Amino acid sequence: MKFTESEKLQKLSDEYILGGVNSPSRSYKAVGGGAPVMMRSGKGAYLYDVDGNKYIDYLQAYGPIITGHAHPHITEAIQEQAALGILYGTPTELEIEFAKKLRDAIPSLEKIRFVNSGTEAVMTTIRVARAYTKRNKIVKFAGQYHGHSDLVLVAAGSGPSQLGSPDSAGVPLSVAQEVITVPYNDIDAYKEAIDYWGDEIAAVLVEPIVGNFGMVEPKQGFLEQVNEITHNNGSLVIYDEVITAFRFHYGGAQDLYKVYPDLTAFGKIIGGGLPIGGYGGKQEIMEQVAPLGPAYQAGTMAGNPLSMKGGIALLEVLEQDGVYEQLDALGKRLEDGLLSLINKHNITATVNRVYGALTLYFTNETVVHYDQAENSDGEAFAKFFKLMLNQGINLAPSKFEAWFLTTEHTEEDIDSTLKAVDYAFSQMK
């Protein structure tokens, strides 16, 4: 494949946009550098770049495009609303309709508020939890990404009794020291942290299924034990379902496992591809938020008609029979093919799959903790990434990210992808 136009445009982008990208995850720094491919359009499971190359897309905007690019039902709904106005600054009936659909799908959402991103949603749930409990400290799990607000850009201390340190320049140490980070899937470490910090802890923040050091499911009983330990301490459970809501199950990961939090943060997927966020939970807790309570949250774009319309249209597609069974079947076909090719070529690699999403790790370990993902072979992934890109397979440029399937991928797409993997593995010996 030729990337001449992408390379030209990247030089121009470098001149005007800091770092040439508007999110560092779009850079190819983690896969050895080079100009990121500039995309021009998308349709279904495919992307098309400025050089005219076609890709089977497994990035899917890091997960939210579960119905594929430019799904007709969603694009028509958005176009219809755009003709009526994009932003009013007033309440609309669409907000009520969308909130009702979300609450019908997810039983824990007694009350809902819309915001504009997953980062904003998580940030606000933390504020609400602190207001409700009148405590300050937060527990989170190593390797889980919760956006880029100060309180969640915190690296782990040396153990459950140790406070965190800033994971980004510009985050004050005083902020980081309100956060305790423990290993995911390690209930003993979590209990130790709760026992040590006790009534200083406002809430635990958890991705019920990890999406940011690859796809990692909770060990059996882990979420139930987190709930029990947390509630016995008088603290709240916050689920970050920015990636997981509606990705694996219509009612989110919490309804899939039948383990429900006190508060939930949403983003990405629920807007049908438009910028969106939301949070919700028990009425008693949510009533801490203005105008009913003392915890402040506001936003000019929050609940804007375009995002509401896109979200409603998305859920209308996902609530149809057979959607998640189809995604699971495609995911299994891809997983089985990858495992077969790993064996064929004697590649040191393993696969974690959760329904219609998976991660290929270049390691011989089954990944259940962040350290295992971090220690996987980044150089091998970088080589694999570029071999796949040159065959028209678009993956996230990071060893930590998932491959996301959509309702528009086909068995033929999976088979074409596996043919590309076969070649890539043959070049990696």
From Swiss-Prot:
This is Glutamate-1-semialdehyde 2,1-aminomutase 1. Its main location: cytoplasm. Its EC number is 5.4.3.8. Homodimer. It comes from the Bacteria. One of its GO terms (biological process) is protoporphyrinogen IX biosynthetic process. PANTHER family: GLUTAMATE-1-SEMIALDEHYDE 2,1-AMINOMUTASE, GLUTAMATE-1-SEMIALDEHYDE 2,1-AMINOMUTASE 2. It is an enzyme of class 5 (isomerase). It comes from Staphylococcus saprophyticus subsp. saprophyticus (strain ATCC 15305 / DSM 20229 / NCIMB 8711 / NCTC 7292 / S-41). GO terms for molecular function: glutamate-1-semialdehyde 2,1-aminomutase activity; pyridoxal phosphate binding; transaminase activity. It is found in: Cytoplasm. It holds the Pfam family Aminotran_3. Its cofactor is pyridoxal 5'-phosphate. SUPFAM superfamilies: PLP-dependent transferases. The modification N6-(pyridoxal phosphate)lysine is found at K268. Gene3D superfamilies: Aspartate Aminotransferase, domain 1 (3.90.1150.10), Type I PLP-dependent aspartate aminotransferase-like (Major domain) (3.40.640.10). Belongs to the class-III pyridoxal-phosphate-dependent aminotransferase family. HemL subfamily. It catalyses: (S)-4-amino-5-oxopentanoate = 5-aminolevulinate. One of its GO terms (cellular component) is cytoplasm. Pathway: Porphyrin-containing compound metabolism; protoporphyrin-IX biosynthesis; 5-aminolevulinate from L-glutamyl-tRNA(Glu): step 2/2.
